[in-house]
């Protein structure tokens, strides 16, 4: 009987060993017994072995068994390092070989489970500490986010530590271990942050505290971070904090107005981030055929039309639209003179009253509410009428007819179609119907952008066309390259450096006002469109696609066309001449973009009498607190402004007005694209290539 019992125990041991082996292979770990529940089967096997020995001994000696002895076995089983059976006195061990095998397997199994458990505890404790230390030493992102958002973010940027305010439960810890998520627990107060990060302050590495989704303590976090920066004099810690769509702009303006801390605090909104990435990757020129452009002049041909259709106009689409109206400024020619080339926008919205803010005119009402007479102001910018807003459902007859009427089969028109209706299914369905209509009517000049939240390959399989682009998924938004975006900030700093080189007084990047920094960011975003107008493009640097000859070719071309710093004043007045070159066209395009940027941010014209010339390097021409700027005018108005500054400077310096017309830098900033192109090198994140 005891031999049979021993064989049963061996069978159970083999099953348990097989289970542990299977789990080790599945998890690809030898030290797999981090789960305390693995103790139960090993203890039960030991209990069966000791109980079998107890019964055998009692039968052999004729002693009466009592319940206490069976209870005492539990204590013996838990003390796996000191087996209570004396090998010399164990009758069953001495007489039954099968039981002996079962016993030694059971003891070794229990010891193995216990030892590997201890190894796991030590391993995970020190491994986590080592990983945290290694990540912190190299500079990293410190993430405050929900588990799903954290998983998405850390998957795209492993050099991230999750910051928790409360200790996670055992189940959550297990999930973190399985996903390789590194975390620490820190209270959100300045003393706790100082204690945790004091060793890494100003160590030459950057640390980004990223808070995804607005929370009850978000504003408190901003205040705590300010105190942290002030107490530590830190210049390498940055806070990136998300605010809801409706709260974002007003809070961002207040936070950014604090010049002491605004260089270190970035308020963001996911829709704004998507919009920036969208216009950076897909300017309105991106997919337009080469025959629409005159690359030698960097213009769109006068007889060509570019249309952008927004199918669905919620938060996502309206934010992209606003960014596009800033970025997608184009130029053409009329009688050998430069003029703006308007992109035609058609907005289809089936939920017209859901959010009133999205229905507002692109240009802020404040700008057009005033009467700008010529005596008090420079020439105001004329309002564009190239936006057509429709409140309709394109699934219904009237809406469908209007939508389809814009999708013309005309070789001189190109259609960018952006579909952001709502659910992924609805967006894909609308795209399928749109593609079918375009094919039926032989429309070739188009590109469709479909927003997919889920990034499902199954949805993408519905389309085999090169004229389809998907955007807007979670990993599209929740990642380091979008929220922190060092490449874009580096390009913005390049733009600012070029601007500052043309000034007599250099302003440190961190001391710039928030609007000027943001202006440089959008100037950096616009580089791809400018390159498209020249016949070039930007792509990711894979380490092998950099072509120095292309950069040299562009620098040589634009260098010959760009007036030198000490050039006569008249060399910049291309808008009064009978001809122009590509550098002139890009300068004019930059002026249009700059105007659009400041208009979108609520600025209006400053009165002529409010402009003050203090000295050659100190001119009061704007007021960020009132959102006023003297240069928010036409190119003709800018020339009048330039003349006024030269006259005022001439009174101060006693130099001829002709000399001060050269010294005043009004026009030179718009030619900065050449200086930015010069910075592209073999190790740049992006490289310039010729358009295919």
Regions found by a protein language model. Give the residues of each.
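An amphipathic alpha-helical core segment
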Residues: 613-621
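…; additionally, a secondary subgroup of soluble metalloenzymes is captured
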Residues: 82
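Active-site-proximal, well-structured secondary-structure segments within enzyme catalytic domains
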Residues: 600, 625, 629-630
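Cytosolic regulatory regions of ion transport systems
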Residues: 2-46, 55-75, 85-107, 111-593, ...
């Amino acid at each position: 009987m005891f031999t049979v019992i021993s064989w049963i125990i061996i069978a159970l041991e083999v099953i348990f060993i097989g289970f542990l082996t299977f789990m080790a292979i599945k998890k690809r770990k030898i030290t797999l017994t981090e789960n305390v529940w693995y103790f139960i089967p090993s203890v039960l096997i030991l209990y069966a072995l000791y109980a079998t020995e107890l019964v055998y001994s009692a039968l052999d000696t004729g002693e009466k068994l009592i319940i206490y002895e069976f209870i005492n076995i539990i204590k013996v089983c838990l003390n796996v390092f000191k087996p209570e059976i004396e090998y010399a006195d164990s009758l069953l061990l001495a007489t039954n070989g099968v039981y002996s095998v079962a016993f030694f397997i059971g003891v070794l199994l229990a010891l193995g489970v216990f030892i590997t458990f201890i190894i796991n505890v030590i391993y995970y404790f020190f491994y986590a500490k080592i990983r945290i230390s290694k990540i912190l030493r190299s500079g990293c992102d410190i993430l405050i986010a929900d588990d799903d958002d954290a998983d998405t973010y850390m998957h795209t940027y492993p050099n991230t530590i999750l910051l928790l305010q409360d200790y996670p439960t055992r189940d959550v810890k297990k999930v973190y271990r399985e996903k390789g998520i590194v975390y620490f627990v820190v209270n959100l107060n300045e003393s706790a942050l100082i204690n945790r990060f004091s060793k890494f302050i100003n160590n030459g590495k950057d640390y980004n505290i990223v808070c995804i989704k607005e929370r009850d303590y978000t504003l408190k976090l901003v205040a705590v971070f300010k105190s942290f920066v002030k107490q530590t004099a830190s210049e390498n810690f940055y806070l990136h904090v998300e605010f809801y769509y409706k709260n974002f702009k007003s809070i961002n303006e207040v936070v950014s107005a604090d010049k002491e801390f605004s260089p270190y605090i970035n308020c963001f909104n996911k829709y704004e981030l998507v919009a920036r990435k969208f216009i950076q990757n897909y300017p309105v020129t991106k997919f337009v055929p080469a025959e629409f452009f005159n690359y030698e002049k960097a213009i769109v041909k006068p007889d060509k039309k570019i249309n952008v259709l927004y199918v669905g106009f919620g938060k996502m689409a309206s934010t992209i639209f606003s960014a596009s109206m800033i970025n997608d400024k184009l130029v053409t020619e009329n009688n050998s003179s430069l003029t703006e080339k308007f992109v035609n926008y058609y907005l289809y919205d089936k939920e017209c009253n859901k959010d009133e803010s999205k229905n507002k005119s692109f240009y802020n009402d404040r700008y057009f509410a005033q009467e700008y007479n010529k005596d008090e102001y420079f020439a105001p910018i004329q309002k564009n009428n190239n936006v057509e807003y429709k409140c309709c459902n394109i699934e219904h007859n009237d809406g469908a007819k209007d939508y389809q009427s814009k999708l013309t089969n005309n070789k001189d028109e190109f259609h960018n179609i952006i579909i952001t209706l709502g659910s992924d299914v609805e967006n894909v369905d609308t795209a399928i119907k749109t593609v079918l209509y375009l094919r039926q009517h032989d429309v070739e000049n188009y590109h469709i952008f479909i927003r997919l939240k889920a990034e499902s390959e199954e949805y993408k399989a519905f389309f085999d066309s090169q004229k389809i682009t998907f955007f807007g998924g979670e990993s599209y938004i929740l990642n380091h390259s979008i929220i922190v975006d060092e490449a874009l900030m580096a390009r913005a700093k390049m733009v600012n450096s070029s601007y500052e080189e043309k000034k007599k007084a250099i302003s440190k990047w961190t001391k710039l006002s928030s609007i000027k920094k943001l202006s440089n960011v959008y100037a950096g975003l616009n580089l791809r469109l400018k390159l498209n107008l020249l016949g070039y493009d930007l792509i990711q640097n894979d380490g092998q696609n950099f072509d120095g000859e292309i950069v040299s070719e562009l620098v040589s071309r634009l260098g010959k066309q760009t007036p030198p710093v000490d050039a006569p004043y008249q060399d910049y007045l291309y808008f009064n001449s009978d001809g122009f070159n590509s550098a002139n066209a890009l300068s004019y395009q930059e002026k249009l973009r700059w105007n659009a940027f400041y208009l979108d941010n609520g600025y209006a014209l400053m009165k002529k009498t409010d402009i003050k010339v203090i000295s050659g390097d100190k001119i009061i021409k704007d007021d960020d607190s009132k959102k006023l700027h003297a240069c928010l005018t036409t190119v003709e108005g800018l020339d009048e402004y330039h003349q006024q500054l030269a006259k005022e400077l001439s009174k101060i310096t006693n130099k001829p007005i002709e000399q001060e017309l050269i010294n005043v830098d009004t026009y030179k900033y718009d030619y900065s694209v050449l200086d930015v192109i010069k910075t592209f090198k073999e190790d740049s994140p992006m490289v310039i290539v010729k358009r295919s």
